[in-house]
Amino acid sequence: MPPASGTRRHRGRSSTCVYCFARKTHSYLDLDTGVGFDTQIVVKVNAPELLRRQLASPRWQGEHVAMGTNVDCYQRAEGRYRLMPGILFALRERANPFSILTKGTLILRDLDLLRQSAEVTDVGVSVSVGFTDTELWRTVEPGTPAPQRRLDVVRTLTGHGIGCGVLMAPVIPFLGDEPAQLRATVRAIAAAGATSVTPLALHLRPGAREWFMAWLGQHHPHLVRRYERLYADGAYAPKWYQRRITRQVHELAEEYGIGPTRAGMPRRIAQPGPTDPTEPDGSAGAVGPAVGAAGAGPVQLTLI
C-alpha cells in the first residue's frame, strides 16, 4: 500500500458519472479517460492481503483509513470480486478507524460487518447524493443507483444505529442549483435521517473536464459558454459561487433539522465478534464512510 495514498482495489468505474474527477487516473496506465474509464476496470484482487500486511507493520500507527475518496468502493465490480468484506475484516481485526464514501447500495450487503467494526473502532458512513432530480440523474450519472435508492441506504444505516451523513455532491451549476432543487434535495436528505449534509460544487479536473464539456455540448449546448466563464480560472467554481451554495444548503439544513457541518457521528454497537469473511461460514459486514481517526491524518484507501 503506497504511503499516504492507500491501496487501489479498482481503477475506473463501471457505475459512471460524466463528471468523475478520477478519470485522469486512467491516463497513468495509458488508458482512455473517457469511454475507457467507463468500461476498462482495473482490479487489485489482492487488496485485502496487502492491507493486512500494512496494518501488521510495526510502522503502522493506526491512522484513519478513508475509502471511496477517489472512485467508489461499492461500484458494480465489487459485486463480482467481493474485496470489501476482507478489507473490512482486516480493519476490524486491528480496531483501525475507517470511513467510506459511496454511491453504491451494495454497502448494505456488508451491514453486519460494519456493525461489528463499529463496536471496536470509530466507523463512519457518507453517501453521495448531489440532487434528487431523476431526469438529471439519468443523463449525468448513468449506471449509478437512483438518488432515492441511495437515500434508502442512509435510512437503513441510521435505522441500524449507524450514523450516516450525506455528501451533497456535486451541486451542478445551472442544472441542479436552483433554490427549489436545493430545497427538495435537502428535504429528502433530512427525511432519510442523515446526520449531516455537506455540499460540494462541481469541480472539473483535467480528464473529467474534457469529458463533461463534451457531454454538456451534446445535451445542453446553451450552457457551454456559461461553464467556460464560470470555470475560466481552473477546476473549481469561483469562491463566491461555492459560498453561495454552502450558505443556501446550510440554511436549509438548519430549517430541516440537520447539522450541515457535523461529520456523521460514529456509533459503537454491541455485537458478537465476527468470523473471517473469507471462511466458508464467515459473515460479511457493513461498510460505510467513517469519521474519527487515530494518529496523523486519514490515509486514503482507494479500492475501485
Residue ranges and their predicted role:
Residues 50, 90, 156, 244, ...:
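Amphipathic alpha-helical segments that form well-ordered structural scaffolds
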Residues 115-118, 154-159, 250, 254:
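Surface-exposed amphipathic alpha-helices with a cationic face
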